[in-house]
Amino acid sequence: MRVAILSDIHGNSIALDAVLADIEAQGGVDYFWLLGDYVALGPDPAGVLARLDQLPNTTFIRGNTDRYVAHDERPFPLKDTVLANPELLDRYVNLNSGFAWTKGAVTAVNKLNWLSQLPLEYRTTLPDGTCFLGVHAAPGTDDGFGFKPGMDIAQMADQLADCSADLVMVGHTHQCMDEQVGDVHLINLGSVSNPVGSDLRAKYVILTADETSHTIEPRFVDYDHQAVISQLETIGHPSAAFISQFMRGEM
């Protein structure tokens, strides 16, 4: 079996198209496992959802931003924090406007209910007997600190305690990592969109498994970041300035 595993598309159909073309160029896959954050924040949430609808053999779980959009929750900074720290007001307004805009776009294509019902995690057993867990941030949560390169091993082990899996794949922090933490093989996929750091390519993995073993191939795909910025500006996205920072490698 061959599986493409993606996370953190964030409403970026340009990046998603590049990834899907790369998957096809690698010979295609049998399954798609998607680990959340599909629509916010980015210029084309409806386009992303339309493309995902066309994929065969898909498994979806939720990310924190999917929950924010579906249930009118919001990321940091919250209102009380802004009242105590007025310098955060611009960020607060920018993010809240962006999530409200995204909810409107998702509602317009009748996908809000779908988004609200996504499960927290996906568990399966690979053909070689490996117990797999896919979750957006960390076992038991779609939010929080997540997993980043350079984390203390004890902190990672604490988040993985009692996960009941041999192989755990996550996204959320937009930073790739591959670590053996005790008995658990931990993979952070990075992100399809809104890259953090200097490597602006879209990132995902292809998992190949049979009855004897499995392999994991990280994939890194170029796409046109300026085209994304132009798309944000053309539609007047309320979070255009914030999202463009990712596209320029400023986050």
State where each predicted segment sits.
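Anionic-ligand binding region
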Residues: G150-I187
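Acidic, His/Gly-rich catalytic cores of divalent-metal-dependent hydrolytic chemistry
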Residues: L167, E179-M251
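N-terminal active-site segment of His-dependent metallophosphoesterases
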Residues: M1-L55, A240
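Active-site-proximal segments of metal-dependent phosphoesterases and phosphodiesterases across multiple
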Residues: V82-L83, T130-C163, P195
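Beta-strand-turn-beta hairpins that frame and shape the catalytic cleft
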Residues: M1-A4, T124-L133, V181-H185, H214-T215
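Active-site neighborhood of phospho(di)ester-bond hydrolases with catalytic His/Asp-centered motifs
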Residues: L6-S7, F32-D37, T59-N64, V135, ...
